[in-house]
Amino acid sequence: MSEEELNNRDTESKQEHDENNSNFEAGSAHMNLPVLPLREVIFFPGDYLPIFIGRKGSIQAMDKALAETSENTGRMLLIAQKNPKKEIPEGKDLYEVGVIAKIAEPKINLQDGGVKLMVIVECRARAVNFRKSEGVLEADVLPIEEEESDNVDIEAYRRAVVQNFEKCVKLSETIPDEIIGLLSQIDSTSRIADLVTASINLKLSVKQEILETVDLLERIKKVHALLEKELGVLQVKQQIKEKTESQIKKSHKVYLLNEQLKAITKELYDKEGEEYDELVDLEKKIGNGKLSAEAKEKVSKELKKLKNMVPMSAEATVVRNYVDWIISLPWKKKGKMITDIAASERILKASHYGIEKVKERIIEYLAVQNRTKSFKGSILCLLGPPGVGKTSLASAIAEATGRPFVRMSLGGIKDESEIKGHRRTYIGAMPGKIIQHMKKAKLSNPVFLLDEIDKMSSDFRSDPAFALLEVLDPEQNAHFVDHYLEVEYDLSDVMFVATANSLNMIPALLDRLEIIRLEAYSEEEKLQIAEHYLIGKLQREHGLKKSEWSISKEALKLLIRRYTRESGVRNLKRELANLMRKAVKKLGVQSGLKSIEVSVKNLKKYAGVEKYTFGTAEPENLVGMTTGLAYTQTGGDLIMIEAVLLPGKGEIRSTGKLGEVMQESVQAAYSFVCSNCNKFGFTSKFFKSKDVHLHVPEGATSKDGPSAGVAICTSIVSVMTGIPVRSNVAMTGEVSLRGKVMEIGGLKEKLLAAVRGGIKIVLIPASNEKDLENIPKSVKNAVRIIPVSTVSEALTFTLAEQPTPLAVDVWPDIPLSSTQQSEQRV
């Protein structure tokens, strides 16, 4: 249906209403009408408009009005609420004056359960008495009679109101222009006053005041005053709009709206003498902060730039974020540190068992710093296998010094920007993780843990390890520049601590670190850690009392041996937690059960099938079977090296998934034995007629390294001479072609494996004798350790009997090829 047809329909409906209700007159006696409370809206006499009803009480009032059979059929009292938030208003919640409205058209039910009505507002009315009838709010209503007057003052105000209203319509963007034509057709001064009041932007209470003003002269005066004020507001708004439009392009709509907001804000603040609180607050923070001179100058320029920007623009957001980052950093804001070295030592000893050398080195480091009041020096790097307490030790250092602790994981980082940030030209740019963690620390002197420093990766674009050089150099980190900040930030008060599992780092970075090695825990150390640290902590976490759960020392040893294989205690902690979970469940299910004790007998019941086996000494001496010692990421272990003799041409082949270094070690050992065969009791002719097959069991496991050289030599000599190898002897050491036994690593872990495997004698390189000082006494007391310098010396301990040397043997002549002969002639 077209708009013209709708207007004709509305006009016909209104005319029909006027004809059918000509007998209704304002000022007649009281009438009883249902009340329809209005929220945030005021209607005036003469309005013909839709209303939407949603509240249950209002719908009931409408239904009652439609059900009325008297001359008031379809009539209701529309009256505004004093508090629009009141959901079910009573009489006291409504104003006294409202309007009588007539339902002009059949109601339309809406999908949301509400109702749409077209009503004609007939006259003002006063509610004399409110009451409820059958759940519907009703009122005794007295229509208010309004009289027109030819008073000269009224006519003067009328003309002024019409003139000013026309100006408002031209300036306003919300009042339609068509209303001016409608105003010219109205003769009633009362209707003009009501129409103007309904059209301009006024508070609900002001419109209610106009509705309650019956005296026409007083009402037209009030409307004139309100219109004058509204006209002034619209004129100022127009001035602001014109001023804004002269500064920007007309096509930039978003920019226009932002500038209008800026101009309005400036107009208000200039008139009231106020300042923009947020920018002033930033200025105060810059002035009161301990920023460096360079940072203060830079951020002041950025703040000045921010004041001249559009608040909602993208560039303003970037600048604001930058200013916030600069202000939020701890510039020279230091925390109070613990200077009592004895107290620091107690904290370290209470937090970690064993590792006395490590704790002693840390205390020395702290003592020097306290005395010199300088933090320039070596950067500590805690090196050790997983689970030995590197990260927790760094946290304990923070506690021992009274500094805040922040941890930055470097594992997998492959972009330099992760360390030094992105430049602000990039979208979404942020500072690097160094600056981010300094903000998190809130102080300029935290303990800063660089975790897994050896796990950084690189690509063809950049290597983040080089970005760390500036951070970890005590001579440079006082002038660290993040790409995002673009100003120097002092990191010289930060105590950097790094952790690593290996030394696979660039030499320049490694040169800046002081390596402190944390070796694998011995079985005794694991036992002590479990008893004094892990069990109590896990009992608290699982809500178990000491009297409710316990584990015997023998069961704990078995748990360590058969259910874990690691250098540290992480898996041991998991296994203990598993035992406690099962205990908590059992105590909850069996009400009569008061406590559970885990012993060797019932350990399998709670922990399940044994997960690991470890190498053990052979029960008897065997030919070609040698016990070696290996070092892995999970600690030490025994490896069995087998050799058999086969008819052949004097060759050796090796199996067992050996790495390149270990294969070269096999070749070196074979060459040494071959070149010294007469010393070991067999001839070169015999040697050339046999092949040796060397095998290292557990073929699915990769093996590499040179430290099995002594064991390989022993197996080859044993199989060549037929002399058995002592099963209670294990050995480790690299072998040269001259039969020298050279230094190896992982001595502590290898000795722990030997003790665990029931070995009685361990041969080590003589050059490793100095490392025995760091071996626990319990280990040295459990096994006999013999340093050896040569293979011949080692064979005196490994073979069940010594071979009888032969006279100097002459190797058979081997015919030269034609090429070799020509080369020899040349």
From Swiss-Prot:
CDD domains reported in the protein's UniProt record: RecA-like_Lon (cd19500)
Location of the Lon N-terminal domain: 33-231
Top-level taxon: Bacteria
CC terms in the record's Gene Ontology section: cytoplasm
Pfam families in alphabetical order: AAA (PF00004), Lon_C (PF05362), Lon_lid (PF22667), LON_substr_bdg (PF02190)
Chain positions recorded as ATP binding sites: G384, P385, P386, G387, V388, G389, K390, T391
Catalytic residues of the enzyme: S707, K750
Ranges annotated as biased composition (Basic and acidic residues): 1-20
Swiss-Prot/TrEMBL catalytic activity: Hydrolysis of proteins in presence of ATP
Major location (coarse): cytoplasm
GO terms assigned for molecular function: ATP binding; ATP hydrolysis activity; ATP-dependent peptidase activity; sequence-specific DNA binding; serine-type endopeptidase activity
Region of interest: Disordered: 1-27
Entry's induction text: By heat shock.
Function summary: ATP-dependent serine protease that mediates the selective degradation of mutant and abnormal proteins as well as certain short-lived regulatory proteins. Required for cellular homeostasis and for survival from DNA damage and developmental changes induced by stress. Degrades polypeptides processively to yield small peptide fragments that are 5 to 10 amino acids long. Binds to DNA in a double-stranded, site-specific manner.
Family note: Belongs to the peptidase S16 family.
UniProt-recorded name of the protein: Lon protease
Species for this entry: Neorickettsia sennetsu (strain ATCC VR-367 / Miyayama)
This protein's encoding gene: lon
